[in-house]
């Protein structure tokens, strides 16, 4: 990768603007998962240790652009950073006209999505952000697939634009999977809809040895094969696509195992009783909400045989304990494996957190859409502009 790293640049005394992905879940003003914050801390600390005056940008949630909403404020994130860094930390609401920050200080700016023009990569906004710094550091892998003012535009206009350590680690981990993976490769792709992961599924069948579909995606494959799935979530418009993927997989030598037994309920609720059933016994009023014990054993065996594992999405409704056994078993099997494993996506990260497996997965990606687009073989806009800018950067 032709990228200039933050560590290649002398940051001492410079105004360093870092775009991080600090989009964490917040409930009643409290951060409920600090995974992304923990991932970003080393980059911020490194810049401060280098004697830089550091300014951090991030989005949080999906506010109406240009409109302030307290529930989407980054103030709780600034409080968190204040407690976890041995440097002065200030929260700045109005920053587009300039930020007064000294070397060895951190200024956390309010949600970039409160600025009109952020999503459309408005040139005027991008230039205002670029004027805040001497060096722009793109470290937010989770937003690298978006050509927005704080990810792409600012990198165009900043005096110097470089890649942060977290972004580099993300790209290197994905590169290990995409460029030189050790076989056999097993991918677990769960979630509600085939439509949201259609490109990924097509890409993976030409790349992996085993592709395990889960959740609503698996239901669509089952329906396409003529199985009774009752009132389970599936996509009727994509049955032909599912059949095409199964044919393509056979041509490419990729195995797509489907559940032989499932866990069903009558309603989608936390109090709904769960019943194990073989696939042939699913009733017209059943809702498939997890994989059954026989399928769990089969999938765990496949995972244990892998040398490379890609995990994106749960195989059941793990938010409800009675339908969480499949996702939990898959997660533990990946954690116990000696294979190189990479996990990404919001629900996947939530499962890793829930089962306390953060230290046992080889690499946990902070990205959702960016993670998927990388696996699909797409070029990320924010990475592309950094590569372009790298051609004109003088390093130490």
Swiss-Prot record:
It comes from the Bacteria. Monomer. HAMAP family: Phosphoglyc_kinase. It comes from Legionella pneumophila (strain Lens). Transmembrane segments: none annotated. GO terms for biological process: gluconeogenesis; glycolytic process. Pfam families: PGK. Substrate binds at residues 21-23, 36, 59-62, 113, 146. Belongs to the phosphoglycerate kinase family. PANTHER family: PHOSPHOGLYCERATE KINASE, PHOSPHOGLYCERATE KINASE 1, CHLOROPLASTIC-RELATED. Its EC number is 2.7.2.3. The lineage of its organism: Bacteria, Pseudomonadati, Pseudomonadota, Gammaproteobacteria, Legionellales. It catalyses: (2R)-3-phosphoglycerate + ATP = (2R)-3-phospho-glyceroyl phosphate + ADP. This is Phosphoglycerate kinase. PROSITE patterns: PGLYCERATE_KINASE (PS00111). GO terms for molecular function: ADP binding; ATP binding; phosphoglycerate kinase activity. Pathway: Carbohydrate degradation; glycolysis; pyruvate from D-glyceraldehyde 3-phosphate: step 2/5. The keyword Nucleus does not apply. GO terms for cellular component: cytosol.
């Amino acid at each position: 990768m032709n990228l200039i790293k933050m560590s290649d640049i002398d940051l001492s005394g410079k105004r360093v603007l870092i775009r991080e992905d600090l989009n964490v879940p917040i409930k009643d003003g409290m951060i409920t998962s600090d995974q992304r914050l923990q991932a970003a801390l080393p980059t911020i600390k490194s810049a401060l240790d280098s004697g830089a005056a550091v300014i951090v940008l991030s989005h949080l949630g999906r506010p109406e652009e240009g409109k302030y909403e307290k529930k989407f404020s980054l103030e709780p994130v600034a409080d968190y950073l204040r407690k976890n860094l041995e440097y002065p930390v200030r929260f700045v609401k109005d920053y587009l006209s300039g930020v007064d920050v000294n070397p060895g200080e951190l200024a956390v700016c309010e949600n970039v999505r409160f600025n009109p023009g952020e999503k459309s990569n408005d040139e005027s906004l991008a230039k205002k952000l670029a004027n805040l710094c001497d060096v722009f550091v793109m470290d937010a892998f989770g937003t690298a697939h978006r050509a927005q003012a704080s990810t792409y535009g600012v990198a165009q206009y900043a005096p110097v634009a470089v890649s942060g350590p977290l972004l580099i680690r993300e790209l290197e981990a994905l590169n290990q999977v995409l460029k030189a993976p050790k076989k056999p490769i097993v991918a677990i792709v769960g979630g509600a809809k085939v439509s949201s992961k259609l490109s990924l599924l097509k890409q993976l069948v030409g790349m992996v040895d085993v592709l395990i579909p889960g959740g609503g995606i698996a239901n669509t494959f089952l329906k396409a094969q003529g199985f009774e799935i009752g009132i389970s979530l599936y996509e009727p418009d994509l049955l032909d696509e599912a059949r095409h993927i199964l044919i393509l997989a056979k041509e490419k030598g990729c195995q797509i195992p489907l559940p032989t037994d499932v866990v069903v309920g009558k309603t989608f609720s936390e109090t709904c009783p769960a019943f194990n059933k073989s696939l042939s016994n699913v009733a017209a009023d059943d809702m498939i909400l997890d994989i059954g014990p026989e399928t769990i054993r089969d999938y765990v065996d496949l995972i244990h045989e892998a040398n490379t594992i890609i995990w994106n999405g749960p195989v059941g409704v793990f938010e409800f304990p009675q339908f969480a056994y499949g996702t939990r078993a898959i997660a533990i099997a990946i954690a116990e494996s000696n294979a190189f494993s990479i996990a990404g996506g919001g629900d996947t990260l939530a499962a890793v957190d829930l089962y306390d497996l953060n230290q046992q997965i080889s690499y946990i990606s902070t990205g959702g859409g960016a993670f998927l687009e990388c696996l699909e073989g797409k070029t990320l806009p924010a990475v592309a502009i950094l590569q372009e800018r790298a051609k004109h950067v003088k390093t130490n």
